[in-house]
């Protein structure tokens, strides 16, 4: 053999050996992969796989026992968890043989949920125990989910507070005089004057009644009344021993108002009807009259010991025996049995008393003492306390003034120049025409709002009283109404786009003081539905306060509409929605009673929650106020030569100072600090918290995830497809059965009607055989 041939044989042998080695390596690699990756073996080598009893189930199967034992662990894993690799999803489903049960067992074998795969086990005990355990955990999960949803649906909120260090916008400030109207202007209207007269009589009667109680001092009570009456030329009474010195008394008839035998007050109008006739003590030297009693309690007696003032002790009084023994010259006298005071009977007839000209009238029959409808409407007859009487009179005054035209009501109160004497903001002068706006309030008359324009934003350059709003206000106390109990001004701090309500939210500042109001601002940010009920655009229709919406105005609007609906008239304390409506009449008993009943039944305009829909604004500013005061003006402070006191005092500094103390109030409104609090309402339990808790609960109790729900959705779709296909197959079979039956019957009918002749009996046999053949098919 040649060397070349030998070399060629060696090369060929080497190549074959190399190929054989590579082939062995491939076989080894395939065997190793078969052991560690049963899925690959399952999908590529069908001889190694034996189908599972359930759809999609696979079992490894090897020829040799040793190989089966080596792959025992992998076979179990493949049977329990990896059967989904060859499930009904990855195969073409045979809807003729597949059932819902097979789909369910396939789902249990491949689902990612915990516990459900054990429900499909072949063990009877394991199957029902795991099913019961899963149902218990499912109930616990549903209960926990109910609690979680309940927490979310409560829509709880939390408040986040943040302090912002920047200058806040200056608010609007509304100032009013505590005396709403000028008394000198009101008395020009007869109805209003009658209201004051009626209040005067009732107050006098109550004070007289209190003084005549055990322990009461009648002189003290009358002294108080006299001091209140002197400045207005009202009815005067003797008040102390000095006034009684030199007095000469005589009896006079007077038309008066009597609450009972002990309470009679002279009427200022002697011609007034519906008044009683009384007899009073009159001091002819001073024109004073006191006390008065009904004529029924006066009797004519013989008195001894009468003084030069024509007063005598009652002979039937407690000290009658001593007086008679001491004086032996009795005179005819008139005595009353209430306080046992007597007067010498005049020689002439007893005359009528008139506070103006003392005209004598003839005695007539006593007119009726019944309370008129007007007096009953005023509501003073049943009141005993002087404060309650005054408060009710103020309300009556609101009703009386509301009946006047709008322009007339403005003229009854104070103008801007009369009320505001000085004004400065941020150490600069104010512009009266530009910075102030008139606001007419039913209770406080003409009020004036500073910084009313919401398009202009005023800010303080610094904190403190020197850089805020400073106002010097003149209240004109000399022209106060008798029902005004305090002298001063009313202040309301509010947002520019809100209606001021001085009767509810205001602060009072007295005269003779510098009243300092330090402000702190809080910005509120509320959440809208479903966490809250706020709205920045909500407006009830109709709305009596125009565009200035606030919850307080909404409640008043609702109450006013309710009054208009039930009573046919509006409450004079609130505006009317249109000119077509009217305010309730102060003298109408029906109107006043209807309004009173509605207020009592509803509990006031803040309690009509069922009939009213009032929402809080989503963004609101709240101003907290700290009050302090100091005396104004100081002794050495130079007010100036422009003193509005009496003109003949010229440059009398003391007189000007006293005038300012009695009639002016200095107001300071400022920020204590140039920062504000921002209170923001946030959701306490959000949708993110809900999903987080829901995921935790479902993972804790039943071991589900979002993927598990997708698997259930897939199972549901497969069942629906199966049911749909089963229905189609059922309908097709039914239709095919009907067609086959009809064709068979037609064939039988054709055979029966065939014209072919046959021997007797042969036709019947052939027909029966054909029918049996068709039926067997």
UniProtKB/Swiss-Prot annotation:
Keywords: Glycoprotein, Ion channel, Ion transport, Membrane, Sodium, Sodium channel, Sodium transport, Transmembrane, Transmembrane helix, Transport. Sodium permeable non-voltage-sensitive ion channel. Involved in the activity-dependent removal of selected presynaptic proteins, such as synaptobrevin snb-1, and Ras-related rab-3, in the remodeling of GABAergic motor neurons. It is a multi-pass membrane protein. It is found in: Membrane. InterPro entries: Deg-1, ENaC, ENaC_CS. Glycans are attached at residues 274, 319, 357, 411, 453, 533, 597. GO terms for biological process: locomotion; monoatomic cation transport; neuron remodeling; sodium ion transmembrane transport. Residues 1-128, 711-777 are cytoplasmic. Belongs to the amiloride-sensitive sodium channel (TC 1.A.6) family. The chain crosses the membrane at residues 129-149, 690-710. Its main location: membrane. Residues 150-689 are extracellular. Residues 752-777 are annotated as: Disordered. This is Degenerin unc-8. One of its GO terms (molecular function) is monoatomic cation channel activity. One of its GO terms (cellular component) is neuronal cell body. It holds the Pfam family ASC. The gene is unc-8.
């Amino acid at each position: 053999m040649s060397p070349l041939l030998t070399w060629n044989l060696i090369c060929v042998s080497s190549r074959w050996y190399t190929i054989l080695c590579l082939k062995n390596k491939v076989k080894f690699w395939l065997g190793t992969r078969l052991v560690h990756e049963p899925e690959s073996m399952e999908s590529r080598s069908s001889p190694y796989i034996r189908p599972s009893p359930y759809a999609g189930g696979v079992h490894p199967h090897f020829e040799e026992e040793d190989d089966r034992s080596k792959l025992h662990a992998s076979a179990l894993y493949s049977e329990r968890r990896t059967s989904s690799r060859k499930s009904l999803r990855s195969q073409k489903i045979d809807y003729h043989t597949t059932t819902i049960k097979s789909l369910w067992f396939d789902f249990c074998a491949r689902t990612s949920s915990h516990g459900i795969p054990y429900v499909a086990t072949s063990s009877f005990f394991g199957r029902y125990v795991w099913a019961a355990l899963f149902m218990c955990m499912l109930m616990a999960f549903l209960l926990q989910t109910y609690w979680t949803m309940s927490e979310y649906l409560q829509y709880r909120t939390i408040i986040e507070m943040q302090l912002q260090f920047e200058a806040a916008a200056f608010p609007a400030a509304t100032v009013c005089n505590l005396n709403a109207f000028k008394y000198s202007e009101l008395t020009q209207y007869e109805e209003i004057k009658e209201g004051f007269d009626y209040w005067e009589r009732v107050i006098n009667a109550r004070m007289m009644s209190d003084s005549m109680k055990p322990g009461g001092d009648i002189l003290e009570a009358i002294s108080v009344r006299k001091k209140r009456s002197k400045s207005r030329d009202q009815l005067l009474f003797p008040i102390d021993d000095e006034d009684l010195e030199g007095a000469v008394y005589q009896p006079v008839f007077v038309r008066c108002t009597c609450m009972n035998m002990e309470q009679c007050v002279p009427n200022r109008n002697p011609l007034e009807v519906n008044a009683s006739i009384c007899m009073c003590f009159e001091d002819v030297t001073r024109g004073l009259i006191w006390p008065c009693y009904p004529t029924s309690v006066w009797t004519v007696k013989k008195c001894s010991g009468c003084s030069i003032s024509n007063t005598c002790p009652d002979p039937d009084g407690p000290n009658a025996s001593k007086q008679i023994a001491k004086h032996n010259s009795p005179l005819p006298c008139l005595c009353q049995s209430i306080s046992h005071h007597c007067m010498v009977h005049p020689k002439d007839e007893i005359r009528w008393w008139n506070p103006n000209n003392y005209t004598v009238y003839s005695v007539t029959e006593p007119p009726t003492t019944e309370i008129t409808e007007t007096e009953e409407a005023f509501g003073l007859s049943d009141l005993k306390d002087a404060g309650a009487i005054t408060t009710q009179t103020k309300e009556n005054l609101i009703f009386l003034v509301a009946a006047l035209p709008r322009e007339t009501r403005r003229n009854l109160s104070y103008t801007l120049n009369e009320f505001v004497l000085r004004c400065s903001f941020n150490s600069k002068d104010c512009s009266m025409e530009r910075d102030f706006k008139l606001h007419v309030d039913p209770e406080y008359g003409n009020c004036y709002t500073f910084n009313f324009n919401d398009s202009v934003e005023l800010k303080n350059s610094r904190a403190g009283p020197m850089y805020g709003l400073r106002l010097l206000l003149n209240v004109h106390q000399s022209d106060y109404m008798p029902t005004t109990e305090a002298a001063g001004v009313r202040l309301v701090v509010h947002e520019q786009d809100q209606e001021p309500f001085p009767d509810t939210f205001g602060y009072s500042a007295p005269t003779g003081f510098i009243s300092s109001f330090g402000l702190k601002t809080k910005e509120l940010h509320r959440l809208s539905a479903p966490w809250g009920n706020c709205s920045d655009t909500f407006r009830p229709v109709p709305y009596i306060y125009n565009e200035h919406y606030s919850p307080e105005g909404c409640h008043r609007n609702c109450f006013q509409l309710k009054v208009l609906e039930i009573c046919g008239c509006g409450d004079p304390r609130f505006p009317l929605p249109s000119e077509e409506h009217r305010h309730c009449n102060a003298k109408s008993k029906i109107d006043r009673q209807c309004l009173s009943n509605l207020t009592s039944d509803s509990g006031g305009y803040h309690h009509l929650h069922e009939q009213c829909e009032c929402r809080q604004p989503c963004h609101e500013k709240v101003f907290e106020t700290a009050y302090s005061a100091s005396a104004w003006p100081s002794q050495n402070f130079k007010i100036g030569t422009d003193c509005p006191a009496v003109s003949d005092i010229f440059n009398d500094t003391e007189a000007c100072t006293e005038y300012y103390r009695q009639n002016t109030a200095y107001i300071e409104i400022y920020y204590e600090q140039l920062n504000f609090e921002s209170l923001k309402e946030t959701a306490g339990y959000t949708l993110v918290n809900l999903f987080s808790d829901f995921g935790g609960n479902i993972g804790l109790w039943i071991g589900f995830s979002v993927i598990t729900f997708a698997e259930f959705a897939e199972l549901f779709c497969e069942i629906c497809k199966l049911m749909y296909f089963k229905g189609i197959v059922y309908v097709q079979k039914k239709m095919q059965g009907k067609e086959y039956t009809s064709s068979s019957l037609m064939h039988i009918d054709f055979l029966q009607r065939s014209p072919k002749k046959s021997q007797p009996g042969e036709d019947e046999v052939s027909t029966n055989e054909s029918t049996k053949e068709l039926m067997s098919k």
